[in-house]
Amino acid sequence: KDLYEVGSVKKVTKYISRKTLIYKTDVEYGDYTMNHVLGCSHGCKYPCYAYLQKKRFGNVVSYEDWCAPALVKNTLELLDHELPKFKNKIKILHLCFTTDPFMYGFDEIQEMSLSAIKKINDAGIKCSVLTKGILPTALVNLSKDNEYGITIVSLDDGFRERMEPGAAPIIERLSALKVLHEAGCKTWVRFNGYFRSCRLCG
């Protein structure tokens, strides 16, 4: 039983289709990335690059719109089409740069992410994953070349409740990471700083 199941299970209410999925990036976690969800239910209150970018270009209209994630319903079909073209170019495919592959409490997003990672691994490509949600124990059954990470901004869960209201509690993130680590998976933690003086941070 995955840890997030102790909380409420949330439902995806929006779906979109895309023409492409995989693209080249300079992000430090991989040389290619994919974003199979638009938006992020974690709703971070400090400046979020992904939210600001998507709002600027009209992909979302408001913070509330951003916090109601839209799942790319043709994710697996796009991977079937694109992986043969990219498989000899990709060193590491990162999930995800502008969203979270394991949004806290979203079964449907979790299942799509697991299916995508399996499909990517079956093509001989390893993945890196970064989340503020819960890394599911099912990842243990996928390639041990994959790299699984969590983001932590503060160990104060009161801060998390104020500034990352939809994200997983810190102890649950760490506990899930420990399960994968003890099962022999490659694991890591990203520590992010924040600016206390920022207007959005109060």
Tell me what each language-model feature is.
Residues 1-2, 188:
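N-terminal amphipathic/basic-hydrophobic helices that include classical n-h-c signal peptides
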Residues 3-41, 45-149, 153-158:
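Conserved Radical SAM active-site core
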Residues 105-108, 162-164, 199-201:
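Short, solvent-exposed loop/turn segments at secondary-structure boundaries
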Residues 143-146, 163-167:
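Short, surface-exposed, charged loop/turn segments at secondary-structure junctions
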Residues 166, 178-200:
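Conserved strand-turn element in the central/C-terminal portion of the radical SAM core barrel
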